[in-house]
C-alpha cells in the first residue's frame, strides 16, 4: 500500500486553520493510503515553549485527531520523541547539508526577525536553523511515498528531496525520494479580520480565529463579524477581493470535510468522493448576498466543531496512550532498519 507521512506540532489551542489546513486533509487521505502521523514534539522546542503544558498539549492533539475520525485500525499515530532514530538521522542529514542551504529557508529568514535584540543583534535558537534537517529525517526515516505538507513547508520538502538524492548518489540507495501532497486551495487559512496574515493563536484579535473548542455562539459571532468588502459578490480572487476569497477558501475546506458529506450532497449534488471546487461555490452563491454566504459557512463550520467536541468527550487519556504505543510499536522497526542501513553505508557499524 502507498504510504504517506505527516506531522503536526503539539503547541496547544488548535483552530479551524489547523483543522482545515492539515487535520481534515489527512483524514480524507486515510481511506486511500496508509497514513503514518507523528506528533512533532521535538520541533515544538525549537522556539520558546512551556514544559508544564507539553504533555497535556500532546494528549489534546491526539484526542482531536481521534475525535476527527482518524482510523487507528488502518493507520498509525506516534510520538516523535519516543523514536530516537529521528534525532540520530537528523544529525546525519545535518552533516550532509550546508549552512547556505539552511540560511536560505524562507521560514528561517522570517522567524529570525523575531529574535532581534534591543542592541540590534540577533539571538537565534540553533534549532530554528536546523529545523529542516530534522524534518527531513522525519520524512526519510519511514521510506514514505508521499508527504503531506502545508504550502509554507514546500521549501523544506524540496531540501529533503535534495538531501535524499545527494546521499543516494554518494552512498547508494538509502532513501525513497518522496513526492509532495500540497493542496492548491485551503492549505493556508488566513485571519478572519486580516487576510494578509495566517490564522494564528498569537493573533492580537481573537475574533480572527475560530478555535476548535469555541461555543456555537462564539463561532456564529466570529463568522458574522468576519471582514468582507462592499461588493457583496462572492468571488475567489485574492488580488481583488482578499477578504471574501479567504472565506471561500474556508468554505471549500469545510464543504469537502468528511463531517459534511451529507451537506455537500444536498447543496451541490456531488458524489461522496467528488470534490466541490471554488468555481462551484461561486456559482452556488450567484445572486446571493454575503449574509447568505456567512449563514452557510457557519452551518458547515459548526457541524465540524460540534462533531469534534462531542467525540472528544468519549476519549480518555488512556485511549491516547494506547494509540501512541501501538503506533510506536509498528513504526520503530522501520525507523531502526533505515538508520542501520544508513550507518552501514557510512561505515559507522563495526
From Swiss-Prot:
Where is this gene product found? Cytoplasm
* Catalytic activity as recorded in UniProt: tRNA(Trp) + L-tryptophan + ATP = L-tryptophyl-tRNA(Trp) + AMP + diphosphate + H(+)
Report any one BP term from Gene Ontology: tryptophanyl-tRNA aminoacylation
Indicate which residues form the motif 'HIGH' region: 10-18
The EC number of this protein is 6.1.1.2
User: Matching Gene3D superfamilies, A to Z?
Assistant: HUPs, Tyrosyl-Transfer RNA Synthetase
- Chief location: cytoplasm
Q: Which UniProt keywords apply?
A: Aminoacyl-tRNA synthetase, ATP-binding, Cytoplasm, Ligase, Nucleotide-binding, Protein biosynthesis
Q: Which GO terms describe its cellular component?
A: cytosol
Keyword check for Nucleotide-binding, yes or no.
yes
Q: Where does L-tryptophan bind?
A: 138
* GO MF annotations, alphabetized: ATP binding; tryptophan-tRNA ligase activity
Q: Which residues bind ATP per the record?
A: 9-11, 17-18, 150-152, 189, 198-202
Against CDD domains, the record matches this protein to: TrpRS_core
Motif 'KMSKS' region: where? 198-202
Is Ribonucleoprotein tagged as a keyword?
Answer: no
**InterPro entries (alphabetical):** aa-tRNA-synth_Ic, Rossmann-like_a/b/a_fold, Trp-tRNA-ligase, Trp-tRNA-ligase_bac-type, Trp-tRNA_synthetase
Pfam family for this entry, one? tRNA-synt_1b
UniProt similarity note? Belongs to the class-I aminoacyl-tRNA synthetase family.
Explain the purpose of this protein.
Catalyzes the attachment of tryptophan to tRNA(Trp).
The record ties this protein, via HAMAP family, to:
Trp_tRNA_synth_B (MF_00140_B)
Q: How does it assemble?
A: Homodimer.
Mind telling me which PANTHER family this protein's record contains?
Answer: TRYPTOPHAN--TRNA LIGASE, MITOCHONDRIAL (PTHR43766:SF1)
Q: What is this protein called?
A: Tryptophan--tRNA ligase
The encoding gene: trpS
Amino acid at each position: 500500500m502507498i504510504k504517506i507521512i505527516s506531522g503536526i506540532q503539539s503547541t496547544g489551542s488548535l483552530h479551524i486553520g489547523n483543522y482545515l489546513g492539515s487535520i481534515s486533509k489527512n483524514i480524507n487521505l486515510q481511506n486511500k493510503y496508509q497514513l503514518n502521523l507523528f506528533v512533532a514534539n521535538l520541533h515544538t522546542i525549537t522556539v520558546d515553549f512551556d514544559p508544564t503544558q507539553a504533555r497535556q498539549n500532546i494528549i489534546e492533539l491526539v484526542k482531536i485527531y481521534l475525535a476527527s475520525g482518524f482510523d487507528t485500525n488502518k493507520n498509525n499515530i506516534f510520538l516523535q520523541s519516543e523514536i530516537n532514530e529521528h534525532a540520530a538521522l537528523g544529525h546525519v542529514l545535518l552533516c550532509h547539508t550546508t549552512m547556505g542551504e539552511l540560511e536560505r529557508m524562507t521560514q528561517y529568514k522570517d522567524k529570525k526577525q523575531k529574535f532581534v535584540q534591543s542592541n540590534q543583534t540577533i539571538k537565534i535558537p540553533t534549532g530554528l536553523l536546523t529545523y529542516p534537517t530534522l524534518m527531513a529525517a522525519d520524512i526519510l526515516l519511514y521510506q514514505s511515498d508521499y508527504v503531506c505538507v502545508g504550502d509554507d513547508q514546500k521549501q523544506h520538502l524540496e531540501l529533503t528531496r535534495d538531501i535524499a538524492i545527494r546521499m543516494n548518489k554518494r552512498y547508494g540507495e538509502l532513501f525513497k525520494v518522496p513526492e509532495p501532497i500540497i493542496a492548491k486551495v485551503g492549505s493556508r487559512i488566513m485571519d478572519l479580520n486580516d487576510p494578509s496574515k495566517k490564522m494564528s493563536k498569537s493573533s492580537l484579535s481573537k475574533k480572527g480565529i475560530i478555535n476548535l473548542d469555541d461555543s456555537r455562539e462564539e463561532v456564529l459571532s466570529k463568522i458574522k463579524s468576519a471582514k468582507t468588502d462592499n461588493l457583496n459578490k462572492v468571488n475567489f480572487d485574492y488580488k481583488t477581493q482578499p477578504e471574501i476569497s479567504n472565506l471561500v477558501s474556508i468554505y471549500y475546506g469545510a464543504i469537502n470535510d468528511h463531517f459534511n458529506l451529507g451537506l455537500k450532497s444536498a447543496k451541490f449534488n456531488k458524489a461522496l468522493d467528488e470534490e466541490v471546487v471554488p468555481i462551484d461555490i461561486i456559482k452556488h452563491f450567484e445572486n446571493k448576498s454575503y449574509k447568505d454566504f456567512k449563514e452557510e459557512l457557519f452551518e458547515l463550520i459548526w457541524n465540524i466543531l460540534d462533531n469534534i467536541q462531542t467525540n472528544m468527550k468519549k476519549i480518555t487519556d488512556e485511549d491516547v496512550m494506547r494509540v501512541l504505543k501501538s503506533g510506536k510499536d509498528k513504526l520503530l522497526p522501520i525507523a531502526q532498519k533505515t538508520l542501520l542501513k544508513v550507518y552501514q553505508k557510512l561505515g559507522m557499524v563495526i
